[in-house]
Curated annotation (Swiss-Prot):
Highest taxon above the source species: Eukaryota
Primary role: May be involved in abiotic stress response through abscisic acid-dependent signaling.
Taxonomy of the source species: Eukaryota, Viridiplantae, Streptophyta, Embryophyta, Tracheophyta
Protein name in the entry: Membrane protein PM19L
A Pfam family it matches: AWPM-19
């Protein structure tokens, strides 16, 4: 059963990693031109929410890409010891991506001219908010399924990796 989990999570992991790298590229380009005062550049423009969106988009991209490194480690080792790091970093990356998603929605709602690069960045952040949530749900589904290596200190309560844990003796009355 562990193979089924890996085969489901691994493609989503790769997809999200590629999308986060694209977000880093577009957000850094837009932020660089925005900081340089080139808001009349055909690809930048924007409105009052643009600066905040760009900051959170680049933050979401960097944290998301870093969390995918923990995810790659988890998929390779597929144990409970790596699941905690992978799931925690994925949840943090999703939270920051959700903030960027909200700012993308606000930027779209305010309107005004936004260049094609900014619109592509908005689209990628919106898509990533949902694919990252799916990835987090799949990881947390594995947290409770017990499909991970038993010798890694699973969550079943048996503590197979803890050599010092001894079950409490029955109380004598």
């Amino acid at each position: 059963m562990a193979g089924v989990g890996r085969t489901m999570i691994a493609p989503l992991l790769v997809l999200n990693l590629i999308m986060y790298l694209i977000v880093i590229g577009f957000a850094s380009w837009n932020l660089n031109h925005y900081i340089n005062g080139e808001t009349n550049h055909p690809g930048v423009a924007g409105n009052g929410a643009t600066f905040y969106f760009l900051v959170f988009a680049i933050l979401a991209g960097v944290v998301g890409a870093a969390s995918k490194l923990a995810g790659v480690h988890h998929v390779r080792s597929w144990g409970a010891h790596s699941l905690a790091a992978g799931a925690a970093s994925a949840l943090i990356a999703w939270a920051i991506t959700a903030l960027a998603f909200g700012l993308a929605c606000k930027e779209i709602h305010i309107g005004g001219y936004r260049g094609w690069r900014l619109r592509v960045l908005e689209a990628f952040v919106i898509i990533l908010a949902f694919t990252q949530l799916l990835y987090v749900a799949m990881l947390h589904g594995g947290l409770f399924s017990g499909n991970h290596a038993a010798g890694a200190g699973g969550y079943g309560g048996d503590y197979p990796a803890d050599h010092h844990h001894k079950p409490a003796a029955a109380a004598r009355v």
